[in-house]
Amino acid sequence: MSKAKIGLGGGKNGATNDWNTTKYIWTKLAPHMPKDKVIWCPFYNKTAPMCEKYLTELGFNVIHKDEDFWENNHGDCVIDNPPYKISGIIKLKEKIMIRLMELEKPFMLLFPASTIQTAFFKRLYERGGFQLICPSEKYDYERFEGEKTRCMWYSVWICWNMNLPKDFIVI
């Protein structure tokens, strides 16, 4: 795997990836998140490391460190909004999901909804364990705390081995 660090904050590689999940989004997802597990949020963003703050406020035990995703493994599951592109890493979304599956780490990852229409997702889906949480609205993200943006795409939570009560949930 490329040594390119998924740490996100600023610079050439992070400039277009500094879009953070709002507290509103985390609040909508919270009823479907495990309260009894340690949640690893591995995709650190130095410009606004808000996921730990928001999830802690919602009562979750969270690990969110400025570390290389490819070289670390924390917690019981991963729930996060990963970067979609990083210069020098092709097929990033696929590589993230494969790494977590190889670690046998259950996950909930927020991706553009079009991700479920890709050939790589169809291949991974055949392995089993996938569930989807579909927002009933288009999410907006924030660059910094409180600074909302208009998103051009719809999003979906792609879940694997999270043992949700249903395979398709609309929130």
Give a label for each model feature:
Residues 1-171:
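Class I S-adenosyl-L-methionine-dependent methyltransferase catalytic core
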